[in-house]
Amino acid sequence: FFSDAGKVTSQGDHAQLSDAARTAFPSIDGSGITVGVLSDSFNTSGNKDTMTTDIANGDLPSSTTVLSDFAGGTDEGRGMAQIVHDVAPGAAIMFATAFTGLANFANNIIALANAGAKVIVDDVNYFSETAYQDGPIAQAINQVVAGGAVYFSAAGNNGRNGFEATFNSSGTTGFSEPLAALTTGATPYRLPITFKSGADAVLT
């Protein structure tokens, strides 16, 4: 049986039943695995709690390593690492920032894998990522997965905010605004989105 790690334990540990899994399989606690975390920053927010205090309190493992950090962040990466430590208290944790551009995000994915991370997680979206082909971030993910790593992105953060439908061509090429109104019986090629009264949305 493994007790909770540190002063505070994430509710997610119980919600996903990883606490029950550790009880049922006490020899499996993440030992021998390094988890790589990508987010904004790890130890630069200026808050009273720091990486050092988190390690002292048992909220992070002593084996925590920071490959690169980002000045002025919220230390969300450290919060993610605390959750990882609750779920897999035996795992080592490694952090690299994803907040200095697409290329550096991609490079840090590879850097984490090269440094030994076998499980890598991120919670970062760039609106400029390509939608219909693999950009540098996706290519880096493909590379580390091909090398044996497992990669998880926080798709659940925006999982209900997408739109999926069968593609219908507009029949035009290139820039085609303003869009003409559809005639009766035409196959719709614009997205049928309905907003409730008083609702707002950001379309990207």
Label each region the model flagged.
Residues 26-31, 86-88, 112-114, 144-146:
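Extracellular/periplasmic catalytic domains that process cell-envelope and extracellular macromolecules
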Residues 40-45, 55-128:
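Subtilisin-like peptidase catalytic core
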Residues 126-204:
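Substrate-binding/specificity loop regions of serine endopeptidase catalytic domains
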Residues 13-68, 153-156, 201-204:
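Acidic-leg catalytic submotif of subtilisin-like serine proteases
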Residues 34, 92, 148-150:
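Proline-centered loop/turn at the N-terminus of a beta-strand
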Residues 46-51, 105-108, 132-134, 162-167:
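Short acidic, glycine/serine/threonine-rich loops at helix termini
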Residues 1-24, 109-111, 115-116, 123-142, ...:
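Autoinhibitory propeptides
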